[in-house]
């Protein structure tokens, strides 16, 4: 069984390579920043990282992470709601809430997780979510995971958005989901 599958996958991979669609992994050998070295020391500009604020190599944050590892160890060892919430999480969430003058804050390990988990607890099948067609995959996944009736409008097309709003008029709540920076179409 495995022999046939391996043979099939080998042919598929060869076809992908022949079509010029094979993606070689770039190995970054420097800290994440705007200019990085990859593979055998090739210097390139990094336009694809999620390091939007340049915080991944901020020395104060690196030192804070080292201090946290010294006092709390490495990693949460579980998801937050089982036994992964530590006092450091609650302290940071309180500081963020205080800074933004909000009632509470919930930290997620990644924005993908935050977007994926946003809509489901807020919306029911009585509601509507109206999503821009070029939203990030994480927003699209979050929309798919919720029970709300789903509508999609053409990217930044206000007339199409208005059409969706009219179609969803009978729903209890109508929420528009749009990206801050549309990154999914290059």
PLM-predicted stretches and their roles:
Residues 118-137:
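Conserved PLP-anchoring active-site segment centered on the Schiff-base-forming lysine
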Residues 125, 145-147:
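Short, structured coil segments at secondary-structure junctions
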Residues 46, 104-109, 131-132, 152, ...:
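General beta-strand structural signal in soluble alpha/beta enzymes
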Residues 112-114, 136, 156-160:
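Short acidic loop-to-helix transition motifs that present clustered carboxylates
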Residues 1-98, 167:
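N-terminal glycine-rich, Lys/His-bearing helix-loop that initiates the first secondary-structure elements
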Residues 51, 151, 155-186:
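Active-site phosphate-binding strand-loop segment of PLP-dependent enzymes
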Residues 79-83, 94-117:
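Short loop-beta-helix segment that forms the pyridoxal 5′-phosphate
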């Amino acid at each position: 069984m495995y022999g046939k599958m391996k043979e099939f996958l080998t042919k598929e991979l060869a076809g992908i390579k022949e079509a010029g669609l094979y993606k070689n992994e770039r190995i970054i050998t420097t800290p994440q920043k705007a200019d990085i070295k990859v593979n055998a020391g090739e210097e390139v500009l990094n336009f694809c990282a999620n390091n939007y604020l340049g915080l991944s190599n901020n020395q104060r944050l690196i030192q804070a992470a080292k201090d946290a590892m010294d006092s709390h160890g490495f990693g949460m060892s579980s998801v937050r709601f089982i036994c992964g919430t530590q006092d450091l999480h609650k302290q940071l969430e309180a500081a963020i809430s205080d800074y933004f003058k909000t009632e509470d804050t919930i930290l997620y390990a990644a924005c993908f997780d935050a977007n994926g988990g946003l809509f489901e607890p807020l919306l029911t099948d009585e509601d509507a979510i109206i999503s821009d067609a070029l939203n990030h995959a994480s927003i699209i996944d979050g929309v798919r995971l919720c029970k709300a009736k789903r509508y999609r409008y053409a990217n930044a097309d206000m007339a199409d958005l208005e059409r969706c709003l009219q179609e969803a008029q009978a729903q209890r709540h109508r929420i528009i989901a749009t990206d801050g920076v549309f990154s999914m179409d290059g």
